[in-house]
A protein has these predicted regions:
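Short linear motifs at secondary-structure transitions and domain/linker junctions
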Residues: 1-4, 11-15, 51-56, 76-82, ...
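Residues in well-ordered beta-strands of folded domains
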Residues: 10, 25-29, 39-40, 77-81, ...
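Flexible helix-coil linker/hinge segments at domain or subdomain boundaries
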Residues: 143-154
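Glycine-rich, charged/polar anion/phosphate-binding loops
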Residues: 11, 62-63, 86-90
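Helical lid/core segments from catalytic subdomains that handle acyl or acyl-like groups
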Residues: 28-84
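Short amphipathic C-terminal alpha-helix that caps PH/PH-like domains
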Residues: 51-58, 137-145
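Small-residue-rich loop/turn and linker elements
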Residues: 3-39, 71-74
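Intrinsically disordered, low-complexity linker/assembly segments
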Residues: 83, 89-123, 127-129, 134-142
C-alpha cells in the first residue's frame, strides 16, 4: 500500500489531503480471551521489528483501543478471519468522507492444482481510489507472497 499514492489520500472538509505514511491499526486477541482489541503501531522496514513492537503494544494495552491512536492521520484498518474462506466482506463506514482503507483477509486454502489462495477484501472510498489502484495493490501483494516460504525453517 505504501508505494500507491491513493492509499495515502484522506478527505478533510472539502479538501483531499495526502498523509505521509500509513499506520496499520488491527484487531488482536490476547491469549485465552475472545474479546479483541485494536492495536495501532507505526510501520517498520523490517517485519520482525514491526511484529515485536506490535506484540509489545498489544500485551501492554488494557482497553479496546488507544484513543490517542484513533486520532492519527494515515490509519489503515486491518482484520483477519482465518476461520473463513470468504468471497466478500462488508465493512462499517463513518460516512461519505471516510477515506480510511479497510483490508480483511481470510483462511488460505490449497487448490486442486496445488496453488495456495488467500481471500481478501479491500474497502476503499471510491472518491479516492479506483480499480487501477486496487489492481496495483493486488500485483504488489502477489509479488510479496511469492517471496514467502511456505514452511520456513527457523
Amino acid at each position: 500500500m505504501e508505494p500507491i499514492d491513493n492509499f495515502h489520500y484522506r478527505i478533510r472538509g472539502d479538501q483531499i489531503l495526502r498523509v505521509d505514511s500509513l499506520i496499520p491499526s488491527f484487531t488482536d486477541l490476547k491469549p485465552g480471551s475472545e474479546l479483541f482489541h485494536i492495536v495501532t503501531v507505526e510501520m517498520e522496514p523490517e517485519p520482525a521489528v514491526f511484529c515485536r513492537k506490535a506484540a509489545q503494544k498489544s500485551a501492554a494495552q488494557s482497553g479496546l483501543l488507544d484513543q490517542t491512536d484513533e486520532q492519527r492521520e494515515g490509519l489503515i484498518y486491518l482484520s483477519c478471519l482465518p476461520w473463513l474462506d470468504f468471497t466478500g466482506v462488508l465493512n462499517n463506514r463513518e460516512g461519505p468522507d471516510d477515506g480510511t482503507p479497510q483490508v480483511i483477509w481470510g483462511k488460505y486454502r490449497r487448490e486442486l492444482d496445488g496453488r495456495l489462495t488467500l481471500p481478501y477484501s479491500i474497502d476503499a472510498n471510491h472518491r479516492l481510489m479506483d480499480g487501477l489502484h486496487l489492481g496495483k495493490f493486488a500485483e504488489n501483494l502477489q509479488k510479496l507472497l511469492e517471496g514467502v516460504e511456505e514452511n520456513p525453517s527457523h
